[in-house]
Amino acid sequence: MLVALGLSMVVAAVPTVASASIPLGTVVSANPANFTPNVASGAVYKFTQVGGTMYAGGAFSSVSTPAGVSPGGTFARSNIVAFNASTGVVSSFVPSVNGEVWALASDGTSLWIGATFTSVNVVARRGLAKLNPATGAVDTAFNANLASGKVTELALVGGRLIAGGTFPGKLRAVNPSTGANTGYLNLSISGSVTTNAGPVEVYRFAV
C-alpha cells in the first residue's frame, strides 16, 4: 500500500522494491568490493556514509574482515558497525545496541539510529537514539520518548528528523537536537493490508 502525503512524501505500508536505470561507463563486476567486512550470521538492513566512514545497521553480533585487510579478524559488534569505506578496516565505533538497527540518518556530525532496541550503551532509549559518529556515545539531550514500537525509516528534511515505524502514530517529525515531537506531522495511519499481515506500519518512505 502506498499513500501520498502533503510533505511530498510517499509512505509504504508494506515492503516495496524501487529501481531506476543508472548509466554506467563499464560493466559492473560480479564482485565489485571484496574488502568490506562480512556478516557471517544475521543481516544488514541499512547503510549510510559519513565522510570516509560507512555505517551498517542490521541484526548481527559480529563482523569479520576478509584476507588482506589489516587489522583483520572477527570483531564483536551489536547490530551496528562502522568501517573505512575505502579500505574496509573496522573502526573503534562500538555502541552497545540491544536490538536490531533498521534505519540510519546523519547530518555529517551526528548519527541517528532507528531500531527495535530499548537501550543503547545502557542508556534507556526506545526505538530511536542519537549517537556521536566517532565514539558511539549516546547524546543524552536527545530523547524521542517513544512509548512502544520500533523505528524502520529515518530522514532529515527541512531541519526535522522524520521517523516512520510501528510506534504510536506511525510517522513523526522530531527535533533533531532534543527528540521532541514538533507536531509537524499529524496523520491518522491505521487499517490493515491483508487478513494475516497484522496492523499497518510505516515501513519505508521517500521525501
Residue ranges and their predicted role:
Residues M1-A4, S8-V207:
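Extracytoplasmic surface signature
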